[in-house]
Amino acid sequence: MVKICCIGAGYVGGPTMAVIALKCPAIEVVVVDISKPRVDAWNSDQLPIYEPGLDEVVKECRGRNLFFSTDVEKHVAEADIIFVSVNTPTKTRGLGAGKAADLTYWESAARMIADVSKSDKIVVEKSTVPVKTAEAIEKILTHNSKGINYQILSNPEFLAEGTAIEDLFKPDRVLIGGRETPEGKKAVQALKEVYAHWVPEDRIITTNLWSAELSKLAANAFLAQRISSVNAISALCEATGANVSEVAYAVGKDTRIGPKFLNASVGFGGSCFQKDILNLVYICECNGLPEVANYWKQVIKINDYQKSRFVNRVVASMFNTVSGKKIAVLGFAFKKDTGDTRETPAIDVCHGLLGDKAQISIYDPQVTEDQIQRDLSMAKFDWDHPRHLQPTSPTAFKQVSVVWDAYEATKGAHGLCILTEWDEFKTLDYQRIFDNMQKPAFVFDGRNVVDPEKLREIGFIVYSIGKPLDAWLKDMPAVA
C-alpha cells in the first residue's frame, strides 16, 4: 500500500489530502501537524477551516484511509511520498525583510525528514516557495542522506478558497515539476499516477522544477494584476461618471481577456497574492531586474491605494470625521465562503476608521470575535506565523464590537461598510436597516453587492466602488 504523509494541516494540506484519500482508497494518507489543537479539530466534527463540501469528504474518509496525527516523525518515516505544506511567510527581519519568503519552517521540515527517514522518499513542495527552493532542500537532504535517495518535486496548489473542494475535484491543471534525470522522471510518474485516479491525463502538466516553482508565483501575480487593473479603472470611473461594471463587462467580452477577476472592489486579500508578489519582487531584485520588480510592485501599490481611497471616501462623506460615530462593518473574511482573514482588506479599512476614532461594529458569518481582535492587533505579516508564536492575549480594541447579526451591527449606526461579498448581504431587509440607523444613513459598498438605486429609493446615501457618484458625494471634498 502506498503511504502518503503531508506535513501541515492548514488550508492547503487538509483539503488536498482529504480529496486524495477520497479518490484513492488504496492509498493511506496521513496529515501531520505539530499543533495539537489543530489536529484535534480535524479529528472532531468542528473542522478547523470552513470550506464548502470539505466536511462530507473528511467524514467519508477519516478513519478509513485518511488520518490526522501529531506524531510527525513516525508517519514521515513510514511514508513513500511526503507533501510539505508548511507556511512560507514573508520575512519580518533580516535580509529581504518585508519581501522575501521565510523558509524557516520548510528548512526544519527538510531536516526532520532527513533525520527520521529509513527508506527512499519522494518529497513534494506543496507550499508556494521561491524559485530554486528545491535546490536548497535537495542540499539539506543529500548532505544528511545516510545513503537514502530523495527526489524533490514541485506540485504547487492552484486552489481558490471557498471553492477548494470543487477545484480539487475538477482542476484546470495539475502541475508537477521534477528533475530531468531517470530518477526524477520516475518520481514525477509516481505522483502522476496518484492524480490519474481522477484527473484526465491532458490536465496533468509536467515541467522542470524551476518552471513549476515560478508558475505558481506568476499565476498569483497575474490574477492580482487583473484585480488592480480593474480597481485602477474604478477610480477613473468615479472621476468621470462611467460605471465600472459596464466597463468591465464590455472589456470582458473580448475573448482574449475574458470576464473573470474583473470585479472592482475595496482590494484583494488572502494569504497568497501580496505575499507571492512581494516574493516575486525580491527574486527580480536579486537577479538584477529592477524594472521588472517595479512593475510588480505597482500591483500592490494600487491595492493599497484602493483601500486607503475607500477609507478616505467614508470619512469625507460623513462630514470629514467619523470620530465617535458607529460604523457597521459587514464582512471581515477576505472573500465569501471562507473564514480566512489573512491580508483581508477589512483589516486596513478598520484600522483607517479606528485611526479617526470611529466605533466599529463587525458582523461576519464565519469569523470569530477572537480572530477579529487578533487580526486588528497583530503586526503585518505576523498572521502567517504559527499560532503559538503569535501574541497570546491580543490587545482588544475597545472601539470594536463583534456581533452575530447584521441587524444588530447596523442598529444606531451612522454608516455601513460592506467589505465581503457574502450572498446573505444581498437579501438583507435594507428598509429595516435604514429605519434603525442614524440619519443621514450612509452605505459604502466595497464589493458592489447591493443595488445602489434601490437603496437610494429607501433614503440611503450610497457609495459603490467605480459607480457614478451620489449627488451628496459629489459635493463632498475630492478623494484621492
Swiss-Prot record:
E.C. no: 1.1.1.22
UniProt record, GO biological process: glycosaminoglycan biosynthetic process; UDP-glucuronate biosynthetic process
Catalytic activity, as annotated: UDP-alpha-D-glucose + 2 NAD(+) + H2O = UDP-alpha-D-glucuronate + 2 NADH + 3 H(+)
Keyword Oxidoreductase appears in the UniProt entry: yes
UniProt binding sites for NAD(+): 8-13, 33, 38, 86-90, 127-128, 161, 272-275, 342
Entry keyword set: NAD, Oxidoreductase, Phosphoprotein
Database matches in Pfam families: UDPG_MGDP_dh (PF00984), UDPG_MGDP_dh_C (PF03720), UDPG_MGDP_dh_N (PF03721)
List of residues binding substrate: 157-161, 216-223, 256-269, 334-335, 447
Residues modified as Phosphoserine: S393
Keyword Transport listed: no
Active-site residues from the entry: C272 (nucleophile)
GO molecular function: NAD binding; UDP-glucose 6-dehydrogenase activity
UniProt pathway annotation: Nucleotide-sugar biosynthesis; UDP-alpha-D-glucuronate biosynthesis; UDP-alpha-D-glucuronate from UDP-alpha-D-glucose: step 1/1
GO cellular component: nucleus
Task of the protein: Involved in the biosynthesis of UDP-glucuronic acid (UDP-GlcA), providing nucleotide sugars for cell-wall polymers.
Family per similarity comment: Belongs to the UDP-glucose/GDP-mannose dehydrogenase family.
Name the record gives this protein: UDP-glucose 6-dehydrogenase 5
Gene: UGD5
